[in-house]
Amino acid sequence: VSLLNSLPLEKFEVDLLALDPTGIFRDNLPDGLRFVNPPGEMVCQHVRINEGRFWRHVTFKTLCIKLRCIMGNHARGRKSRARMCHTQYYNAVWKRHIPDLPKKYDVAVSYLDGMNYYVIDHVCADKKILWCHNDYNKLDLVPAYDRSYYAKADKVCTISDVCLKSLIDNFPSMDDKLEVVENISSPRIINAQADMTAEMTG
């Protein structure tokens, strides 16, 4: 949200794809954004099966894929778990069933860790920027799986020198595309959140 509020939107045309466009930060988004509805397959991939949003988007096909992921992940052996974590396993199963975005972009930014795979696999853009908001060593991810995705990105951004070091340790051959972009603090967002907290405690 802070990144979007910091951009000079009068100079750019910005599309925003959000899994939950009615989320808690919806009112803090700047004017001028164009919202792109996520495909139902993408929602079903990321939303838990016991949530209402899953059932609002589900089809017989996506229900079968979801159940396959759940049961398949439980049944995976040691070799499979060494190649990919459950998030990466889910992506490997779902990616062939999720449609590509029809529009071509100058730049595509995956601002959340879980969307890195989507941007690489399903978005057509001249440049692609991925994000890692945490110390990679503390994430339940297998570097060997992510290596092919990071290789296709123009930049992989993270939020601190500590997080950068963890990326370099895991992807030493890609240090030229790894970069720190510290968290952006928007005064407007901070004030809005403070007002929200005051209302909740008030």
Q: What are these model-predicted stretches?
A:
Residues 127-133, 137, 151-192:
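Donor nucleotide-sugar binding/catalytic pocket of nucleotide-sugar-dependent glycosyltransferases
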Residues 114-118, 125-142:
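A short, histidine- and acid-enriched strand-loop-helix "catalytic/donor-clamping" loop
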Residues 92-105, 135-159, 163:
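Membrane-proximal helix-turn-helix segments that form the acceptor-binding/catalytic region
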Residues 82-87, 96-113, 129:
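Short N-terminal targeting/anchoring amphipathic segment
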Residues 96, 190-202:
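A short helix/loop element that forms part of the nucleotide-sugar donor recognition site in Leloir-type
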Residues 1:
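A short, glycine/small-residue-rich beta-strand->loop->alpha-helix junction that serves as a flexible
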Residues 11-81:
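N-terminal strand-loop element at the rim of the active site
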Residues 70-74, 90, 109-115:
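Short His-centered aromatic/hydrophobic patch
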